[in-house]
UniProtKB/Swiss-Prot annotation:
Protein name as annotated: H(+)/Cl(-) exchange transporter 6
Source species, domain of life: Eukaryota
Organism field: Mus musculus (Mouse)
Glycan-linked positions: N410, N423, N433
Domain CBS: 606-663, 808-869
Transmembrane segments: 81-113, 128-150, 176-194, 200-217, 277-294, 335-364, 371-392, 463-482, 488-512, 554-572
Keyword Mitochondrion recorded: no
Motif placement: Selectivity filter part_3: 488-492
Site (Mediates proton transfer from the protein to the inner aqueous phase): residue numbering on this chain: E267
Compartment(s): Late endosome membrane
Binding-site list for ATP: H631, H632, A633, T850, R851, H852, N853
Chain ranges for the short sequence motif Selectivity filter part_1 as given in the UniProt record: 156-160
Catalytic activity: 2 chloride(in) + H(+)(out) = 2 chloride(out) + H(+)(in)
Length: 870
């Protein structure tokens, strides 16, 4: 068995020799490395913790509700709206800082290099120009990579991590202030360093961090700065603000508030309502107009004109006045757009496949090595990218005659060109007077300027240049995404796709004779096709692109192209963000399960090996349970016995638990008496028996299936009260799986808080003497609750008793063992649950379900077992 545990059985992952896997908990499966594909088996996986999106309605929370009236409710709602507005404004200011810094560094770099190239073209010292460009790029990339060493979670775009967070997975450090600082400064250095990355993706992460941290008014990174702000101290509230912040990030990046709202809905949040929709849209609007206000004032000096809605502006698409037959697009063009969507889906699937292999190589060979290796890899990517850009511009670029269109652009494009200096958009590197280098015009401009060139400058790029640019950019962008620098993928994908679309337009014009088609439209459709093939978003991306173009007539072709690209790409692999989520082993829950999973029931996927606590438990037992398990919640149970009165006489602790059990049993007669209706027709002895007797008698048990039986045996009751009577190998199956009446759930964080604050009572006293904590005191340490291993045991009396009933959740969501998996999945995902108890018909807990039991890989394993038992 040891051999099976230490290695992975590749030929028969679920065969008899690996039978031990079937008894492992979902946490063990995650730690030991179960993956969906055999080729991914060597990749490490991590036991991610879930977030508490379900509200715990315990006694402290009920006390808060009792003090709540309409006035306080309106005040709470008003504070939430103000916080949402502040999140939008702060996200817009973050975008303004990133954009201003990138422009400053990029203009400085290109200005120095362009002057050097112009001088060295005649003197023959181009190697010096290359060294200057390398000096700038390597310095910026080195700084970006160093920031990732400080906070590794700042690497990449952050969209996969935020998607996981909104799905209910706690990714360590993802919404910390230090992460925000490293992400913001890192992305401006990586973009300024000439890497083929974008700043729009990290803006989504930055907005999410602002949304998570601003309502707390405190930070782990700045522990001394604390405010007594009593609101929003739960994962449930933080999730809503993170959704708003992520949407604000999209809105600030693209000037698309509606698209940002739909992005947060489509890619992130598992729970949504009308009130949250309004707040998210308001937050997105606040971010968009904050950024627009300051950018318009800084760049044009016209404060309040609102001319630049986002970091990326596509400009207005408009045919030239001289071409009367030109149309933005016609019905005949839809056929070409569908074909481009298919090609974009294939290219996106290829991009994702190559990037996945690179990511797996990094996880095997780069990440296990010293952190300096990651910095060296980033510098290597920067070195190769810089050399390729410089050499391609010098060798592969064509010198083309500068036309009036190239010099000034059309009227719709004039505003954008003027804001960035007309002379900087057309590069004459290595070309004589009155000509320009088309390859250098794409490579030696910012990515946003290059996209605008492809969208609006007609006839400025040859097909050979576009093809070479696409190939080089495709390969280098694929290599760059995943390195240890903050990096986005939206703009590189748009630029790569725009080059592909312009290439298609040039071919149709030159070889098919469609001289009146608008090249900018094909560039936009190509950008949408490639981006859709990479990220596989449809609804939100359609709206984002429409808002960015400010042209509603593009709605149909963009939507058709994105749908075709997604369907084509899905035939081969998942979107790039889902690929990276899968490689990291995050237990992400999709929108729904496969149809065949309905063959399984809750009893097939639940974990029957339970670690539980009693309503009244000694501190010694609680500490033992907390220190020997990694579970984050424990069922609160009492044992189901018929001879309970025998044990109530000699043990006060057992007596307290049995009394709680009897008081918690609700009967129809007891409820009727509570409501004050007349019960005089019932004899008092009969009424007493009805109120106190057990809910139902148990049927004879079958020997074949002990896991689903709840039998009564003559064993010692409540063994978990005494650590020396904890489950042992000598116990029978009946003793291990004894019948347990379910009363509620208590979280690990709640138990540790009770121990830290000394909430307990002596056995000689009544449980009413136990100190009580308020809701504010229970949530004071949120989100960093104390750890049980940091607890000083010398300060605790192990014989003291803790009454957990006031602090447990007495009414969590539960399911029957016969509930189909699709119903379990929908309940778990839509309600944002962390634990789902499985309770039988007589109120006894028989198992518990976590998100690890609902992952696709776990369900596939259980489905294979189901087929084997048929």
């Amino acid at each position: 068995m040891a051999g099976c545990r230490g290695s992975v059985c590749c030929c028969c992952r679920w065969c008899c020799c690996c039978g031990e896997r079937e008894s492992r908990t979902p946490e063990e499966l995650t730690i030991l490395g179960e993956t969906q594909e055999e080729e991914d088996e060597i990749l490490p996986r991590k036991d991610y913790e879930s977030l508490d999106y379900d509200r715990c309605i315990n006694d402290p929370y009920l006390e808060v509700l009792e003090t709540m009236d309409n006035k306080k409710g309106r005040r709470y709602e008003a504070v939430k709206w103000m916080v949402v507005f502040a999140i939008g404004v702060c996200t817009g200011l973050v975008g303004l800082f990133v954009d201003f810094s990138v422009r400053l560094f990029t203009q400085l770099k290109f200005g120095v290099v362009q002057t050097s190239v112009e001088e060295c073209s005649q003197k023959g010292c181009l190697a010096l120009s290359l060294l200057e460009l390398l000096g700038f790029n390597l310095t910026f990339v080195f700084l970006a990579s160093l920031l990732v060493l400080i906070e590794p979670v700042a690497a990449g775009s952050g969209i996969p991590e935020i998607k996981c967070y909104l799905n209910g997975v706690k990714v360590p450090g993802i919404v910390r202030l230090r992460t925000l600082l490293c992400k913001v400064f890192g992305v401006l250095f990586s973009v300024s360093g000439g890497l083929f990355v974008g700043k729009e993706g990290p803006m989504i992460h930055s907005g999410a961090v602002v949304g998570a941290g601003l309502p707390q008014f405190q930070s782990i990174s700045l522990r001394k700065i604390q405010f007594n702000f009593p609101y929003f101290r739960s994962d449930r509230d933080k999730r809503d603000f993170v959704s708003a912040g992520a949407a604000a990030g999209v809105a600030a990046a693209f000037g698309a508030p509606i698209g940002g709202t739909l992005f947060s809905l489509e890619e992130g949040s598992s729970f949504w309502n009308q009130g949250l929709t309004w707040k998210v849209l308001f937050c997105s609007m606040s971010a968009t107009f904050t950024l627009n206000f300051f950018r318009s004032g800084i760049q044009f000096g016209s404060w309040g004109s609102f001319q630049l809605p986002g970091l990326l502006n596509f400009g207005e698409f408009k045919c030239s006045d001289s071409d009367k037959k030109c149309h933005l697009w016609t019905a005949m063009d839809l056929g070409f757009f569908v074909v481009m969507g298919v090609i974009g889906g294939l290219l996106g699937a290829t991009f994702n496949c190559l990037n996945k292999r690179l990511a797996k190589y990094r996880m095997r060979n780069v990440h296990p090595k010293p952190k300096l290796v990651r910095v060296l890899e980033s510098l290597l990517v920067s070195l190769v990218t810089t050399v390729v850009v410089f050499v391609a511009s010098m060798v592969l670029g064509e010198c083309r005659q500068m036309s009036s269109t190239s010099q000034t652009g059309n009227g719709s494009f004039q505003l954008q060109v003027t804001s960035e200096d007309v002379n900087s958009t057309i590069k004459a590197f290595f070309c004589p007077n009155d000509t320009y280098n088309d390859m250098a015009t794409l490579f030696f401009n910012s990515q946003e300027s290059a996209i605008l060139q492809l969208f609006h400058q007609d006839g400025t790029f040859s097909p050979v240049t576009l093809a070479l640019f696409f190939i080089l950019y495709f390969l280098l962008a694929c290599w760059t995404f995943g390195t240890s620098v903050p990096s986005g993928l939206f703009v590189p994908s748009l630029l790569c796709g725009a080059a592909f679309g312009r290439l298609v337009a040039n071919v149709l014009k030159s070889y098919i004779g469609l001289g009146h088609l608008y090249s900018g439209t094909f560039a936009l459709i190509g950008a949408a096709a490639f981006l859709g093939g990479v990220v596989r978003m449809t609804i939100s991306l359609t709206v984002i692109l429409i808002e960015s173009t400010n042209e509603i007539t593009y709605g149909l072709p963009i939507m058709v192209t994105l749908m075709v690209a997604k369907w084509t790409g899905d035939l081969f692999n998942k979107g790039i963000y889902d690929v990276h989520i899968g490689l990291r082993g995050v237990p992400l829950l999709e929108w729904e399960t496969d149809v065949e999973m309905d063959k399984l029931r809750a009893s097939d996927i639940m974990e029957p090996n339970l670690t539980y606590v009693y309503p009244h438990t000694r501190i010694q037992s609680l500490v033992s349970i907390l220190r020997t398990t990694v579970h984050h919640a424990f069922p609160v149970v009492t044992e189901n016995r018929g001879n309970e009165k025998e044990f109530m006489k000699g043990n006060q602790l057992i007596s307290n638990n049995i009394k709680f059990k009897k008081s918690s049993i609700l009967t129809r007669a007891g409820e009727q008496r509570k409501r004050g209706q007349s019960m005089k027709s019932y004899p008092s002895s009969e009424l007493r028996n009805v109120c106190d007797e057990h809910v139902a008698s148990e049927e004879p048990a079958e020997k074949e299936d002990l896991l689903q039986q709840m039998l009564e045996r003559r064993y010692t009751p409540y063994p978990n009260l005494y650590p020396d009577q904890s489950p042992s190998e000598d116990w029978t199956m009946e003793e291990r799986f004894r019948p347990l009446t379910f009363h509620g759930l208590v979280l690990r964080s709640q138990l540790v808080t009770l121990l830290v604050r000394g909430v307990c009572y002596s056995e000689s006293q009544s449980s009413a003497s136990q100190p009580r904590l308020s809701y504010a005191e229970m949530a004071e340490d949120y989100p960093r609750y104390p750890d049980i291993h940091d607890l000083d045991l010398t300060l605790l009396n192990p014989r003291m008793i803790v009454d957990v009933t006031p602090y447990m959740n007495p009414s969590p969501f539960t399911v029957s063992p016969n509930t189909h998996v699709s119903q379990v999945f929908n309940l778990f995902r839509t309600m944002g649950l962390r634990h789902l108890p499985v309770v039988n018909a007589v109120g006894e807990i028989v198992g518990i379900i976590t998100r690890h039991n609902l992952t696709n890989e776990f369900l596939q394993a259980r489905l294979r077992q189901h087929y084997q038992t048929l």
